[in-house]
UniProtKB/Swiss-Prot annotation:
This is Transcription factor MYB13. SMART domains: SANT. Signal peptide: none annotated. One of its GO terms (biological process) is regulation of flower development. Gene3D superfamilies: Homeodomain-like. GO terms for cellular component: nucleus. The keyword Nucleus applies. Pfam families: Myb_DNA-binding. The gene is MYB13. Induction: Induced by abscisic acid (ABA), drought, light and wounding in leaves. Down-regulated by drought and ABA in roots. It comes from Arabidopsis thaliana. Its main location: nucleus. Expressed in roots and flowers. Expressed in shoot apex, axillary buds, at the basis of flowers and branching points of inflorescences.
Length: 246
């Protein structure tokens, strides 16, 4: 099967609908309904194709279609549904009674899409301004006040450091003096101990020498005693030997 010829080749009209054509279509659908859109134009006596009759009825001639501009609630609903469903205009139209998919598509592309982009750009600008303001340096007065506060803090810190260093130097000098004093008196005590120890050693040496002298004297005395004793005994032996000879 090839492609069906267009409406012009078979003698059908295209373009805007006239008021007479709208009246014929409304009367026929009101009496017979629309069970078959392809056969409806011939039965109604219209030189239109079935698709054109269907779109004309659904988008413009239905009695339950809302006329006029979209309300803010409807616009917000379309925006939220478009974020969820995308370009599914029939599904969006099913959530909005009285609004057609073609009408919703037209209002989206002509009005809502631009408004959404504008609000997004505005939000981006506000975010950029807020981040830029947060990153920008403060005013000269604030800078001067902050620098004065910083200088005051640094001055106080330096003064505290100087006082702490003075205290540390004073405590260190006191510690040094205490150490020197302790070392001095310890040296004095050691010297006294050395002197007393030397005196004791000298006394021990003198006593030892005296004992040696006494021992020598006693030894000499004993030697003299035994020498005298031996010599006297030898004399006695000699006298006795002389007596025995007589």
């Amino acid at each position: 099967m090839g492609r069906r010829p267009c409406c012009e080749k078979i003698g059908l009209k295209k373009g805007p609908w006239s008021a007479e054509e709208d009246r014929i279509l409304i009367n026929y659908i009101s009496l017979h309904g629309h069970p078959n859109w392809r056969a409806l134009p011939k039965l109604a006596g219209l030189l239109r194709c079935g698709k054109s009759c269907r779109l004309r009825w659904i988008n413009y001639l239905r009695p339950d279609i809302k006329r006029g501009n979209f309300t803010p609630h409807e616009e917000d609903t379309i925006i939220s549904l478009h974020q969820l469903l995308g370009n599914r205009w029939s599904a969006i139209a099913a959530k909005l009674p009285g609004r057609t998919d073609n009408e919703i598509k037209n209002v989206w592309h002509t009005h809502l899409k631009k408004r959404l982009h504008h609000s997004q750009d505005q939000n981006n600008k506000e975010d950029f301004v807020s981040t830029t303001a947060a990153e920008m340096p403060t005013s000269p007065q604030q800078q001067s006040s902050s620098s004065a506060d910083i200088s005051a803090i640094t001055t106080l810190g330096n003064n505290n450091d100087i006082s702490n260093s003075n205290k540390d130097s004073a405590t260190s000098s006191e510690d040094v003096l205490a150490i020197i004093d302790e070392s001095f008196w310890s040296e004095v005590v050691l010297m006294d101990c050395d002197i007393s120890g030397n005196e004791k050693n000298e006394k021990k040496i003198e006593n030892w020498e005296g004992s040696l002298d006494r021992n020598d004297k006693g030894y000499n005395h004993d030697m003299e005693f035994w020498f005298d004793h031996l010599t006297s005994s030898s004399c006695i032996i000699g006298e006795m030997s002389d007596i025995s000879e007589f």
